[in-house]
A protein has these predicted regions:
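NTP-dependent small-molecule kinase module
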Residues: 160-226
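P-loop (Walker A) phosphate-binding loop of NTP-binding proteins
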Residues: 34
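Conserved substrate/cofactor phosphate-moiety recognition/catalytic segment
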Residues: 48-86
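A glycine- and Lys/Arg-enriched "phosphate-lid" helix/loop adjacent to the NTP-binding pocket
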Residues: 113-185
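Hydrophobic anchor at the beta1->P-loop junction of P-loop NTPases
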Residues: 31
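Conserved lysine of the Walker
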Residues: 39
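Glycine-rich phosphate-binding loop used to anchor ATP phosphates in small-molecule kinases
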Residues: 75-144
Length: 226
């Protein structure tokens, strides 16, 4: 099973066509950020303007996710192992895909952020955690790291508003404490991250995707790191 969307048939006619750098050779761009930070919006923007193959989070394919949000302690380990195995498959697929690819949330986030948060809150038992982390560490040794990581960050009130507006049933009862814990882990992880260059974007205002001047400035920031 593949978790990518179809390649866009046409590019945005209003965007400056001089930016062809992203298609000159194969690149792997990763988009990271908390729940509701705007990852899918950014991935869609990149795919509309460039011939980039997107790879998305396999949320809908996870048979444990709905149960996980209802009872995290019972279903955390099952859900995280599912994500880990499917993210590994996605990494294999994107490495075999010709041209530049962009991924909505990486396997690193699954382990370093989400699984870690669950273990620290005692929703994953120590024995299960040790098994999970050994599997993750083994997988990481065979992965191609991103050429660029785009880290999206915005205030907690903005995250909660976006989560409410998009109305996903399984997300409606996410505790605020859980979101705050994820954000702390994200910030700590970014400080330790060394696989590639990182561009941090504040997404509280999405003008950088709707205003032409801001869009060009945004792409120039990314271009400098590729």
């Amino acid at each position: 099973m593949h978790f990518w969307a179809s390649r866009p048939e046409s590019l945005d006619p209003d965007f400056d066509p001089s930016y062809q750098w992203i298609m000159s050779e194969k690149k792997y761009i990763a988009v990271a950020g908390n729940i509701g930070a705007g990852k899918s919006t950014l991935v869609d923007f990149l795919c509309r303007n460039y011939e980039i193959q997107p790879f998305f989070e396999p949320n809908e394919a996870n048979p444990y996710l709905a149960d996980f949000y209802k009872d995290m302690k019972t279903w955390s380990f099952h859900s995280q192992v599912f994500f880990l195995s499917h993210k590994f498959r996605i990494h294999q697929d994107l490495d075999e895909t010709p041209g530049t690819v962009v991924q909505d949330r990486t396997i690193y986030e699954d382990a370093e952020i989400f699984a870690t948060a669950l273990y620290k809150s005692r929703k994953i038992k120590k024995r299960d955690w040790q098994t999970y982390w050994e599997l993750y560490s083994t997988i990481c040794r065979s992965l191609r790291p991103p050429d660029l990581l785009i880290y999206l960050r915005c205030p907690m009130r903005c995250l909660r508003k976006r989560i409410a507006l998009r109305g996903r049933q399984m997300e409606k009862d996410i505790p605020l404490s859980y979101l705050k814990g994820l954000q702390t882990l994200y910030d700590d992880w970014i400080e330790r991250y060394t696989f590639s260059e990182v561009v941090t974007i504040d997404t509280e205002k999405m003008d950088y995707l709707s205003d032409l001047v801001h869009r060009i400035d945004f792409m120039k920031k990314i271009e400098k790191h590729l």
